[in-house]
Design a protein with these regions (language model features):
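N-terminal entrance/gating region of PLP-dependent enzymes' catalytic architecture
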Residues: 1-71, 77, 267-268, 395-481
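Gly-rich Lys/Arg/Thr-decorated short loops/hinges at beta-loop-alpha junctions or inter-strand turns
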Residues: 47-59, 77-81, 110-112, 140, ...
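Long, charged amphipathic helices and adjacent flexible linkers at domain junctions
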Residues: 147, 254, 384-404
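Conserved phosphate/anionic-ligand binding catalytic regions in large, soluble enzymes, centered on
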Residues: 217-230, 234-235, 279-283, 430-451, ...
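Conserved C-terminal alpha-helix-loop-beta "cap" of PLP-dependent enzymes
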Residues: 297-379, 387, 419, 425-430, ...
């Protein structure tokens, strides 16, 4: 074994980082470039007063964080038009799977075991749903939503709004038809798009999920980011994860706490429908503060700028004789190029989404500027148009409802105001820069300063999760070494870095055990023994893996 000083660790990490190649990515697929306000980066992301706090089981020492998370829930509910929101989930794929499980558990009829998924959903989301559905006996039907056929065996459906290819469709009639067949609908959506698009709530969806990453959290090669989940009152006792509620203390003062905990795994155990425990709270706080700092007007300005630049690119390509797949879009277009563009894109250090049929997807984001549009037009051999246009989607889908009206989103728009607000909340919380936190459980770990420093290096933070493998050699080398070290530490032959939390690790392990028994022809071996002293996620994970608990 080798012992490294902190300085040597940073040098070793820098060597990993230097093997990565940072290009500007227009890949989209749920992940977008964002500008992190420095007041948030410096005073939350790099501040141990925020990143060393423990799970807020004790509300008395967590009031600052609980307020920041309540802001996140308010952001999500206002954006989606649905009254109940949690704070938060692990990623969009997990959130979609949780929505599917929630709908399934809310269905009384035993014959309802089919779930419809639009091919317009992000591919990685569909893959997560495949994994989560099989142990529960849920049958997935993946098709174009226009080909959906409703019958009594279907309990729910998932639609992407806007789609992974950028298309914006009016799902009102489809959702209404689903309701007539007692089928629940979840929309996977985008927070920035929803600032100017009609809300899922107004479309009468039962739930909405998505990734909050583009609200001030870097790519990080895929994470960590906070996912969001909102739903109707009907599901408030079935929604997964933490819900922050407003209450009063014994003196009658306003106080915040985790609400409706009796539905969660640490209380319901094997009767829980989800193993979600803590989940990306620091990132949820960053996204909520992004919304607080920008406020509704500036967020809509960012959205309109993104939509306008996307329109300029679309119009330029069309004028150059290139067919755009969809006429209605927010930030993403798909088209079939008619020139050899690869070398030009490489020279400009741009990444685009490449489909199997040779078509290209380009997603515009907050970091995109006019010069980028000019260069992209040049790459595909067309002249740029100066045409300006907003709301490049059907008029009936333009948002007219209120947005982020709460006072907290309309007060702190200067650096000084924001700095003071962040500090005020920080002082209401207990963290390692105040005292030790002797609460045990699964979350007792030190986030050392030396660990946090490299996280903000561009070579790590600015890599899109679907960047070509030749651009992420540093990450791949880091993963290889980490897997080797963890295997030696645990005495196993190999390990997986895929699970996004301890609870997801349990679930993954149980799926491996289940797959082994199935491969040996022992499908009947489906009982999982869990001691009473086990963490609540253990029995919940076993149920999700299709096992019974004793």
């Amino acid at each position: 074994s080798t012992n490294y000083s902190e300085e040597e660790v940073l040098k070793k990490l820098k060597k990993y980082a230097q093997k990565n190649t940072v290009l500007k990515s227009f890949i989209g697929q749920g992940y977008y470039g964002t500008i992190i306000p420095n007041v948030i980066k410096r005073n939350i992301f790099e501040n141990p007063g925020w990143y060393t706090q423990y799970t807020p089981y004790q509300a008395e020492i967590s009031q600052g964080r609980l307020e920041a998370l309540l802001n996140f829930q308010t952001l999500v509910s206002s954006s989606t038009g649905l009254p109940i929101s949690n704070a938060s989930l692990l990623d969009e794929g997990t959130a979609a799977a949780e929505a599917m499980a929630m709908f399934y558990n809310a269905t009384n009829a035993q014959e309802k075991n089919k779930f419809l998924i639009s091919t317009g959903c992000h591919p990685q989301t569909i893959e997560v749903l495949k994994t989560r559905a099989e142990p529960l006996g849920i049958k997935l039907i993946i098709d174009n939503e226009n080909e959906f056929i409703f019958d009594n065996s279907i309990f729910g459906m998932l639609l992407q709004y806007p789609s992974t290819d950028g298309n914006i469709a009016d799902y009102s009639n489809l959702i209404a038809d689903a309701k007539n067949h007692e089928i629940f609908t979840c929309l996977a959506s985008d927070l920035l798009a929803l600032s100017i698009l009609k809300t899922p709530g107004e479309l009468d969806a039962d739930a909405c999920v998505g990734n909050a990453q583009r609200f001030g959290v870097p790519f990080g090669f895929g994470g960590p980011h906070a996912a969001f989940f909102s739903t109707t009152e009907k599901f408030k006792r079935k929604i997964p994860g933490r819900i922050i509620g407003v209450s009063t203390d014994k003196y009658g003062n306003r106080a915040l706490r985790m609400a409706l905990q009796t539905r969660e795994q640490h209380i319901r155990r094997e009767k829980a429908t989800s193993n979600i425990c803590t989940s990306q709270v620091l990132l949820a706080i960053m996204s909520s503060m992004y919304a607080v700092y920008h406020g509704p007007n500036n967020i809509r300005t960012i959205a309109n700028n993104v939509n306008n630049l996307c329109h300029q690119l679309s119009s330029s390509l069309k004028d150059g004789g290139i067919k755009i797949f969809y006429k209605n879009f927010f930030d993403t277009i798909r088209f079939k190029p008619n020139n050899d563009w690869e070398k030009l894109a490489h020279n400009e250090k741009y990444n685009f989404r490449i489909y199997k049929d040779g078509s290209i997807g380009i997603s515009i984001d907050e970091t995109t500027v006019q010069e980028d549009i000019n260069k992209i037009c040049n790459i595909f051999g067309v002249l740029k148009t100066n045409e300006t246009s907003y709301y490049n989607f059907p008029k009936q889908l333009k948002r007219n409802s209120s947005y982020l009206e709460h006072d907290v989103f309309n007060r702190y728009h200067s650096e000084t105001e924001m700095l003071r607000y962040i500090h005020k909340l920080e002082t209401k919380d207990l963290s390692l820069n105040t005292s030790m936190i002797p609460l045990g459980s699964c979350t007792m770990k030190l986030n050392a300063t030396t660990e946090m420093v490299p996280v903000t290096w561009p070579e790590f933070s600015d890599i899109h999760p679907f960047a070509p493998l030749e651009q992420v050699r540093g990450y791949l080398s880091l993963f290889k070494d980490l897997k080797s070290w963890l295997s030696k530490l645990t005495g196993f032959d190999d390990c997986s870095l895929q699970p996004n939390s301890g609870a997801q690790g349990e679930y993954t392990g149980l799926l491996v055990i289940r797959a082994y028994h199935n491969s040996c022809g022992n499908k009947h071996r489906n009982i999982c023994l869990v001691p009473d002293s086990a963490h609540g996620t253990n029995p919940a994970s076993a149920i999700m893996a299709g096992m019974s608990v004793e």
